[in-house]
């Protein structure tokens, strides 16, 4: 069987993520057979949980029941987990000190983004450097630290409505933005973002949150963010904290990490 790519969060998981009555309410790693990481977790074939980086997380009874139930949409979903048995968030300084965990980790990250800090956030396939897209000082600082003063940056918006605040979007562009790969789409800018983002080209790259963690972050921040890959020039994206700290420790202020390996 072909190895599937990583898919952005599906509508059903998104509903559960925001439902206070659901046991996966605010679970930053919610997924099912229709969405979530695949390619980024596989260590070897066949594609079974034991051969993925989720193998170290033992499923709780409830997750196990879902995994074994052919009528459940989490039937044989290899990355399935919940708050009780799944990966955890940690907010760290670049010397490796853990400042906060889980809900508090996300809260501290958001507070620091509001304060103009640059945060490395571990996504499905690697770390991204993130700052508040409406804070022109933070944007300039990120470009300076990354030594890419003239390279345009993409912004992540919490939803289509927010994206429409900053770009002109037609029906086909909206469809692509909302697709299950959540690609960056180059759009005609409304020119109300800090000029350094698009380097004056008249267009802006926008994408919507691909993961539950990004949805939770943007819902609370209520501002678009810059999200650019955390990689030294002409090298692949960094995927673990130790690499990040040693290679890009001077570029970001803090890191929002998790213990699900890539």
Locations of regions flagged by a protein language model:
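Active-site-adjacent structural elements in enzyme catalytic cores
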Residues: 2-262
């Amino acid at each position: 069987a072909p190895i599937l790519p990583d898919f952005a969060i599906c509508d059903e998981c998104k509903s559960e993520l925001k439902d206070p009555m659901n046991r996966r309410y605010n679970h930053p790693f919610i997924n099912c057979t229709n969405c979530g990481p695949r390619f980024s977790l596989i260590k070897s074939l066949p594609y079974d949980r034991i051969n993925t980086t989720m193998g170290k997380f033992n499923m709780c009874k409830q997750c196990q029941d879902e995994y074994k139930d052919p009528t459940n949409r989490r039937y044989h979903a290899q990355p399935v987990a919940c708050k009780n048995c799944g990966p955890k968030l940690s907010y760290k300084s670049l010397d490796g000190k853990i400042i906060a965990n889980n809900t508090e980790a996300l809260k501290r990250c958001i507070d620091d983004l509001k304060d103009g800090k640059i945060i490395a956030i571990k996504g499905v396939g690697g770390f991204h450097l993130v700052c508040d897209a409406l804070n022109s000082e933070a944007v300039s600082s990120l470009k300076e630290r990354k030594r890419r003063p003239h390279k345009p940056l993409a912004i992540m918006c919490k939803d289509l409505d927010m994206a429409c605040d900053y770009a002109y979007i037609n029906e086909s562009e909206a469809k692509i933005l909302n697709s299950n790969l959540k690609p960056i789409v180059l759009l005609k800018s409304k020119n109300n973002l800090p000029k350094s983002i698009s380097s004056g080209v008249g267009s802006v790259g926008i994408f919507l949150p691909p993961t539950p963690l990004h949805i939770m972050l943007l819902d609370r921040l209520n501002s678009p963010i810059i999200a650019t890959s955390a990689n030294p020039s002409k090298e692949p994206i960094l995927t673990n904290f130790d690499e990040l700290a040693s290679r890009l420790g001077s570029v970001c202020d803090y890191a929002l990490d998790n213990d699900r390996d890539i």
